[in-house]
Curated annotation (Swiss-Prot):
InterPro entries per the UniProt record, alphabetical: Toxin_22
Regions annotated as coiled coil: none
Protein's UniProt name: U17-barytoxin-Tl1c
Leader sequence residues: 1-20
Compartments it resides in: Secreted
Amino acid sequence: MKTIIVFLSLLVLATKFGDAKEGVNQKQKKEVTQNEFREEYLNEMAAMSLVQQLEAIERALFENEAGRNSRQKRCLGENVPCGDNIPCCGKLSCEKTFGYPWWYKSPYCVKPSSG
């Protein structure tokens, strides 16, 4: 209980005397407001405006590209059933497998034979 009282009293003292540098803070605020209207600040603001414009143009370009369905459609991998409605990937071909016809009821995506 005594430690809590000590910490609470320290907290009260810190909040009471913590803003002893209020005059310094007022000077810093005044300097900041004066610096806002310097040429460097205006140049920096112009650069930020340019960056925002470029980001808006980039966003518009990517929206148009996404609207054109420019991405390749998903396709199946190797050893996966395929058919007329389900295509294989570019380098694979849809072939009917041999052996166990009761097991393999549809053609599968396989690597084309080189022979």
